[in-house]
Amino acid sequence: MAFRHLASAKLKTFFVLCAALLLVHAMIYKVPSLYENFSIGSSTLIADVDAMEAVLGNTASTSDDPFDVWNSTFSPISEVNQTAFMEDIRPILFGDANETRPHCNQTPPHLVGPIRVFLDEPDFATLEKIYPETHPGGHGIPTECVARHRVAIIVPYRDREAHLRIMLHNLHSLLAKQQLDYAIFVVEQVANQTFNRGKLMNVGYDVASRLYPWQCFIFHDVDLLPEDDRNLYTCPIQPRHMSVAIDKFHYKLPYSAIFGGISALTQEHVKAINGFSNDFWGWGGEDDDLATRTSQAGLKVSRYPAQIARYKMIKHSTEATNPVNKCRYKIMGQTKRRWKTDGLSSLKYKLVKLELKPLYTRAVVDLLEKECRRELRRDFPTCF
């Protein structure tokens, strides 16, 4: 009797294990993935063609001549010697403009759709070994063809080295596959100042523009990692909100007018909206201000389909030097009146250091907080 019970128990266990294996097999090979417009059969991803057409439909056509749009008529950064320093390193950083290779295809040939997100934290020496083809300053160029888009990635930064290494790992992997002529500019604010994301974006645009004839600029938070390689970091027809679906927000827009996280604009767009506001010291407001000035300039914010424009956000704690800006709503309430005079046209800063790191260009800047707050107090006397 005991033997029959034991045999029966083993038989039940066997059937349970078989059922579990069949269920796992079905989940892997038959069930649609989390990406709504993908299905998985074996290990082959079948993309929704309409989604990719929407991406390409939002990509601007660019000039065949890589240097014909370079407008070098910029005002001095703040001191003449800084501008001269940039002129000296420009040929070292970006080399010769002569090209004999064919242009890259409009659709990069090696895209697969959803990709692995690297969350490990390799040190810089390891990353340099992983991406040996990257030129000084974090400049990547395709070797087999001439890139159709010249893109500067602007990253506002302070005291998040682990996040920076993770982001560099993910971005270099993605951007090389997309056959872009790109460089990553990390704009680092000096210590003992309230963080100012919008102004750092303006500084990054200003510094990057002096080094190379970029066609477009992608303003990129350090804690956002792309999940799909069809999310092209190319020049947009209209200003593009790129971080449409973020895991922290359950891959949904928190609100319809959001324009934060990652935004892509051509040089013409940036000039038309006068860049970002310089006046949002602390957390919040500058992204909504950006949306308002984009609308005021007669432009519209575009987005890729949510199943492509997906990001993972690296978790982080609240930073003492980035407190909530309690005056953000008062400043935002005046954007329609102030946007033409608050931005690139009023940008003041001091370039402390410019370094060509193997994987990125590092610009350390003093945003002159005390001086700028005194000027801002005239418009908002109860805030500062």
Swiss-Prot record:
Mn(2+) binds at D223, H316. Disulfide bonds join C104-C145, C216-C235. It is found in: Membrane. Its EC number is 2.4.1.-. The chain crosses the membrane at residues 13-35. Its cofactor is Mn(2+). Residues 36-384 are extracellular. It comes from the Eukaryota. InterPro entries: Galactosyl_T, Galactosyl_T_C, Galactosyl_T_N, Nucleotide-diphossugar_trans. Coiled coil: none annotated. GO terms for biological process: carbohydrate metabolic process; glycosphingolipid biosynthetic process; positive regulation of Notch signaling pathway; protein glycosylation; response to toxic substance. It is an enzyme of class 2 (transferase). Pathway: Protein modification; protein glycosylation. Glycans are attached at N37, N71, N81, N98, N192. GO terms for molecular function: metal ion binding; N-acetyl-beta-glucosaminyl-derivative 4-beta-N-acetylgalactosaminyltransferase activity. Residues 1-12 are cytoplasmic. It is a single-pass type II membrane protein. Keywords: Disulfide bond, Glycoprotein, Glycosyltransferase, Insecticide resistance, Manganese, Membrane, Metal-binding, Signal-anchor, Transferase, Transmembrane, Transmembrane helix. GO terms for cellular component: Golgi apparatus; membrane. Catalyzes the transfer of galactose onto proteins or lipids. Required for susceptibility to pore-forming crystal toxins in conjunction with bre-1, bre-2 and bre-3. Belongs to the glycosyltransferase 7 family. This is Beta-1,4-N-acetylgalactosaminyltransferase bre-4. It comes from Caenorhabditis briggsae.
